[in-house]
């Protein structure tokens, strides 16, 4: 295993500075036998590892709770996203995602060392983008990348319609520079992006245009508008937006949180969300969604929040 050894050298020693802190296992790289060296002094582990900086080179790769393709998917790594590897065993790498700190296992074959891959400059902004062999939509297709994937783009083609990316070309209408900001107002872009995904299959752990869960949808469309968001709905509830006053009407782009669920308003009455009831991304009256949650919860709506 071509990594810095787990215990950072034979003579490395670490001392806990007081009691171990409480931690969220979803975003804390601690496995019992091994932990990120950044946790040394905060949490005990028999060994600590310096993360190896890797990057997803596959179109996408599921992040799993345990090594093995039959284990539960907990999130998804998209092309061009960073993954910090702490251990490799067989075909699986254990570590955490660079964009949100989520911890899990991904297939080794989906990763390359970041030194061997160009730094991404653009995001796939369409539901999916094709990488063509030539700057011509009639040419052969090299690969298909989902919404949210990151690529390194170079100079424009002579016609101005394509950007060079690796050995291929991507249409300019399908990408935007990383970090592009969107102003949140009554016509904000989050809802328009979500509407592109109507009919996309519900996929537990998914966060791409090919399949996604409720919080994956919210995280991805916010990322595309230049806003960092955590992975799960409870994490998003804690940090995103401001509470909307009771009695104030909802508007396009507002977030509504339910028990273990989140959706985005497309107007004052209707919500778009990836849901397991319809097993896809759908638009429906907010009242219908609330009625379903009211069957199993005394508090079907946890919060209504507005991004600013």
Segments predicted by a language model, with ranges:
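Low-complexity, Gly/Ser/Thr/Pro-rich intrinsically disordered linker/tail segments
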Residues: 293-308
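A generic structural signal for residues embedded in beta-strands
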Residues: 56, 85, 153, 257-258
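Loop/turn positions that initiate beta-strands
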Residues: 80, 142-153, 252-253
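Short, conserved secondary-structure segments in the cores of folded domains
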Residues: 72-73, 140-141, 240, 246
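...with weaker cross-activation on analogous glycine-rich loops/strands in unrelated enzymes
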Residues: 227-287
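Boundary regions of SH3-family modules and the immediately adjacent low-complexity/disordered segments
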Residues: 1-52, 68, 75, 79-90, ...
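Short, structured beta-strand/loop micro-motifs enriched in basic residues and often containing a Trp
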Residues: 58-68, 124-136, 233-244
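Active-site nucleophilic cysteine motif
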Residues: 194, 206-225, 229-230
